[in-house]
Amino acid sequence: MKENLFLFFDDKNKLSRNGFERKLGKPKVVEIYKDPNAYTAIGFPAIWYDEDKGKYHMFYNGYVDGKCAPLAAISDDGIHFTPRNTASESGLKNPFAPNQIMEGCGELANVYVDLKAPKSERLKALVTYGDSKTTRIINDPLYTSADGIRWLRQPVQWHNHAAEPGAMAFYNPVLDKHTIIARPDAGVRRIGLIETSDFKTFSDIRLVMTPDSLDEPLAEHYGMPTFPYENYFIGFLWIFHVPNVRERKYYKGTVDAQLVYSYNGTNFNRTLREPFFTNYDAPETKGMVYPSSMYVNREGRLLVAASASENEHGYFKDKGVIAIYELRKDGFISLHTEDSGDVITIPMLYRGGDIKVNLKAEHCSCALYTDDSDKKPLNLLTHELIPLEDFTHENCEEFSGDTLCWSLRWKKGDLESLNGKIIYIELKVKKGEVYSIKGNLTPMMICDLARYHLHGIVPDITGIG
């Protein structure tokens, strides 16, 4: 049975919590990559790990002598990159830089790794091409490649209007479709969504995110790279903080990123209206930071590649680096307590295996409860929590320290004896933070219990099925 991960973006799966506050994780810059020939303030890097050769490849835009070109770099560990000599390998005639991958294609919006495609077309380059005379984007071609060196233009347009660099794609297993996140049209700073099953036909773009009344005054949404993460989809919403002047919103103003998330890859929710990737992580990021690729390297490190610049918006061609951030596994948002806190989940259908907690705490214990819903499935409003005698806080093998995976254990109780039962999980934490709970668990809302006990129906946590 597939395990489910429970992050703390919201309280949907909690019955009660006391003494906790939500706290954003802290991605840390672990490396700064500077292209020797290009400025990459709006490089929007994409990372591909070539399992056959054991190498990480980074594709990005760079300005070389004021001209934009799609470029590539290579790495052994996904952190330390060097330019890849792609221009000579692919036989480019007049490259701007030795690590250029294509000529005359326009700007690189994103390179997507399509694991469902034949190997010859596994890399999909979403490109935007503009008319230099009118400065208007006139088409959005698609290129494919097997190796990231030789690219073939396909006879399709991936956007039915006009996108811009900063678009990206991900696979949605809930719908079994590829999803492209892009602007609804050129210059329209809102977030749209396109779906395709085969990269031959594409849906019309539909709006999924736009500034609201809780955003700071005048803020605009610049892009929203999104990534499947266990049973979630996690996005980095680029926020353009524009100056309060009566002029066109282009020159000056900083860019940072806030967290968004989805259970189904279609409907997205905001989290804390605070920067997750801030402008003060490194001197090179004080003007703009655009996280555009999230990946786990072979060592299990959760990494994010981002374009960054000390310049503010509109000044793209004379500065820019690519920052590599590291983030704690599941370390997006925690439940944090400076003193003591307790949290108990809603009822969960437990189907065997370990229950694991990612946390850092001076002290933590766990107790399990059940209820009488199996005996009174239609008595929806008065289910009583019943302590499980061998799974109390007193019997828990308590934890102190910092771990990505604390497997719950009790001195007497055998967790497997509860397989198939409804349980509630209660954590008591002293001075610490909890990042996630993971296990063969399905959350059961009030009517789900009746449907399960009467008809054996297990709810679909995505909200689509």
Predicted regions and their residues:
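Carbohydrate-active catalytic/glycan-binding domains of CAZyme proteins
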Residues: 1-465
